């Protein structure tokens, strides 16, 4: 293994890609140059787990399609969330990221799957590419991510290559600009015209739907499903959203164009259900409705998860070390509270403030840390149902905004 470059030199190399320019956050390095190197057995176990978890979600979708009453009785979806689900007709997947952990006892556990607007692709691909020469004879598992992404888009588009692709994202937020940029690079390399904009830039045209005057064949939707629908607060003491109403005009325009076969949307709006963490609770609360194989995989990979409404609050309050609280659509570090990492007071305050119908309780599991004590979160990209790469973040406790990203490699030989 070669000596790593100085971080400032690496940061300039990163900037030279034209994709990633923010190598620091609040003065701290965002990245670790030393990669995580997985054994063949570890990589296989993680990839296999991600694909099996994807299959569990597909079975959940099939179950829910046969039990539409669960949209109300279990998920409590809003009218526009139900519109998204029903319009998608069971379609939910294009690209997802399963966040997996290797535990001290050897298990692989999945805390959640981002099936709606997964991010990190730029960091995963570019870090691996730039730092590969410093890691000796290892395999870069992210080399094929761009090709897998393209094959998925073509398949989603009925086997036809899209000509004009609109990438719809929250243009006022900078967090995922690198991902938008690398998507654009991948698509333009395939000969596509790429148009960037927000839902408010969509408009009707003779061909179906357009953005800035350009008719679109395909839309990559990097705008969360819970932002397209009605916005709901999840805390008893939270002020209502200033913009709680659904994006009715853009949403109806896109759904109608897709229904009429004028545009393909990836990820499909059916992700409004799979992204909802109550889906994890459904796996456990209705486990007997799943196939025997899916039951075995749920017990193997998904920590016991239940709706907070089904729990005895005093029992949860008194067993902080056993549980993690998560809101239905919250992100890591945002509306996720790990019992072992907070005080008794913070835990009880969370339970007192949380609106139970929007929360789940998930069993805490102990992660096998790296030698330096950080906990690796192995994000496995699932593209068209197949594992296609890794996005690894290292954190002191739960994965949050202070986690650092490291390249991920796999040994070429050995165990």
Task: List each model region and its residues.
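Preference for protein termini
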Residues: 1-415
């Amino acid at each position: 293994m070669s000596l790593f470059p100085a971080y400032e030199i690496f940061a300039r190399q990163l900037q030279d890609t034209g994709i990633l320019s923010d190598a620091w956050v609040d003065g701290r390095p965002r990245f670790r140059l030393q990669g995580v190197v997985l054994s063949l057995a570890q990589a296989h176990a993680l990839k296999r787990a991600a694909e099996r978890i994807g299959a569990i979600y597909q079975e959940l979708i099939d179950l829910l399609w046969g039990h539409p009453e669960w949209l109300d009785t279990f998920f409590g979806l809003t009218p526009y969330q139900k519109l998204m689900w029903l319009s998608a007709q069971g379609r939910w997947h294009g690209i997802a990221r399963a966040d997996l952990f290797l535990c001290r006892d050897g298990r692989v556990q999945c805390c959640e799957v981002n099936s709606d607007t997964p991010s990190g692709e730029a960091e995963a691909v570019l870090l691996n590419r730039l730092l590969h020469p410093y890691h000796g004879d290892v395999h870069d598992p992210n080399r094929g991510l761009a090709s897998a992404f393209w094959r998925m888009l073509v398949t989603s588009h009925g086997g036809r290559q899209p000509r004009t692709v609109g990438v719809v994202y929250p243009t006022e937020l900078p967090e995922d600009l690198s991902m938008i940029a690398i998507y654009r690079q991948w698509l333009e390399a395939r000969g596509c015209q790429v148009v960037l904009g927000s839902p408010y830039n969509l408009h009707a045209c003779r061909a179906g739907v357009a953005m800035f005057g350009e008719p679109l064949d395909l839309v990559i939707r990097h705008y969360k499903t819970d932002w397209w629908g009605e916005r709901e607060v999840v805390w008893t003491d939270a002020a209502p959203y200033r913009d709680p109403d659904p994006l009715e005009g853009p949403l109806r325009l896109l759904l109608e164009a897709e229904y009429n076969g004028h545009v393909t949307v990836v990820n499909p709006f059916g992700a409004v259900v799979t992204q909802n963490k109550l889906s994890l609770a459904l796996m456990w609360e209705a486990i007997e409705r799943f196939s025997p194989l899916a039951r075995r995989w749920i017990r193997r990979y998904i920590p016991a998860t239940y709706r907070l409404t089904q729990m005895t609050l005093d029992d949860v309050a008194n067993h902080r070390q056993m549980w993690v609280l998560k809101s239905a659509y919250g992100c890591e570090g945002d509306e996720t509270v790990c019992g072992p990492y907070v005080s008794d007071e913070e835990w009880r305050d969370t339970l007192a403030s949380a609106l139970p119908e929007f929360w789940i309780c998930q069993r805490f599991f102990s992660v096998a840390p790296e030698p330096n004590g950080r906990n690796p979160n192995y994000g496995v990209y699932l593209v068209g149902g197949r594992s296609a790469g890794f996005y690894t973040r290292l954190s002191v406790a739960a994965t949050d905004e202070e986690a650092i990203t490291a390249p991920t490699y796999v040994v070429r030989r050995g165990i």
